[in-house]
């Protein structure tokens, strides 16, 4: 029986059965980071969402059949401004932030994409597409800039499903007396005086650099061709970024539909307000790493809500994710778990537009099953289902011992445990209690055994 994967398509505003153009060559493009600042956890939601989508598509079509491209934007005005502010070179800044992004993705358990192109390495492709747009009268040169003529693009508002006036309400538009229309956007901009040489490139229109939107059109075309299956990104990219990508790509290649399925993840909020660098209410992934919050906890938090819904970041949500993982790891402790086929109900939850809240509930039900099982065989089956399902969504990649003792100085604790045993041996109950309480303050629980030994675990 053929697997049916239903995925919400922003373009049609409905859930559609995912049917790639070629089942042996499934193509997926996701907008990656602009590497000027350490990614905040809101940026990283996109990384986790599309990592899960990648895993599902691989499960259906096979790893060799799927090509996943996620770009790095390493040419941008924000990069120039921040490098100047920090007093570092462009390359120093972009290299440092790119490495931090990779560490963040590893921390969150994300698989590597098939290809990770950098914008600066594809300037020639961008120039070629811009030249096509000029030749087809979809772009024009004005005041040393190259602009895309928005009114020349058929169905420009299709993705956002709003009229042109509504789309541009509240959106900053760079005004220029030389533009044909106020909404026209930059494909190529000239270099400014005293700008870093490695942020500008030779072109038929003089020294300059590309606009943001043309970068993704060029890199997707280079690695996936005129048409591909999935384009992903945050909901904030629907307009103007993805709208402009569609317009310029379809106009450059008139027979192209560009991406068939458009997938967008919701915002991360803090106290109900969108998390963003401009608002200053953001928390970087590095902040969470420095607090020794395990990556699996953050990943489960990001998967706890449906990917299209807003998700509010708060300490309680992180604590709840930690408690859930503790419960799952406790359920498989001291059980000989084995990988089994993915349970049908679990897989069906993910095949229904990546319904991760239901998937998490199903794993919780298996954990409950372990604790109420009447036979060892039943316990083992439930525990095996837990680890199989959790592994599939990128969780529970440690042993229970590693999980519960992560970040713990075992040598230090064992020394205190032995010191307490000596105190008990000499009936120094006061010292024994002091050591127990000291460890309890450090969230280490001692359990005295009938044979006189003591075992410990992290709370």
Curated annotation (Swiss-Prot):
Binding annotation for Zn(2+): 31, 216, 241, 245
This protein's record includes keyword Metal-binding: yes
GO cellular component: cytosol
Residues where ATP binds: 277
Span(s) of short sequence motif 'HIGH' region: 33-43
Motif ('KMSKS' region): 274-278
Family: Belongs to the class-I aminoacyl-tRNA synthetase family.
Name used for this protein in its record: Cysteine--tRNA ligase
Species for this entry: Rickettsia rickettsii (strain Sheila Smith)
